[in-house]
Regions:
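Terminal alpha-helical segments
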Residues: 1-145
Length: 145
């Protein structure tokens, strides 16, 4: 579990939705330097993914009590596992399946942004990543209502 220190020095759990806020700021920032702009858009995609991945993982771990996500030395690819657990969830609720599908799609965008030397339509890809992230977070919040 990751904690940050609050103003009074007490441990606080990190709010992963803050990564989405950062992603939105990065994507909205205009820059005259094209290299800097590209770095911001790529970072926006990456932060959007990690925001939703961590929230989805925590839902499975903390709400669904998934035992595989409690272990320190995991024998799974956590990124694939979390998405597939939503897609193939025993309830097969439409919301659950959509979360998994959107998370997989967002991960593909994140991998391109983090590892590909050239990325086409970066502005559009960043908008898509933010939309997917917002949809995932909305769907996750509906599951906990």
């Amino acid at each position: 579990m990751i904690y940050i220190l609050g103003l009074n020095g007490n441990k606080m759990r990190f709010d992963w939705s803050e990564y989405l806020n950062l992603a939105q700021e990065l994507a909205a920032t205009n820059s005259d330097c094209s290299g800097n702009r590209e770095a911001k858009l790529r970072s926006a995609i990456s932060r959007a993914y990690y925001s939703t991945f961590c929230l989805a993982r925590n839902y499975l771990r903390d709400i669904e009590k998934d035992p595989r996500l409690f272990r320190k030395n995991r024998d799974i690819n956590e990124h694939q596992y979390v998405a597939k657990e939503f897609i193939y969830h025993p309830t097969q609720l439409k919301n659950m399946v959509k979360i998994g599908e959107n998370l997989s799609r967002l991960r593909e965008l994140r991998n391109k942004a983090d590892y590909e030397d050239t990325m086409f339509n970066l502005q559009r890809e960043a908008r898509t990543a933010l939309m997917l992230a917002e949809n995932i977070i909305t769907a996750l919040s509906k599951l906990t209502e």
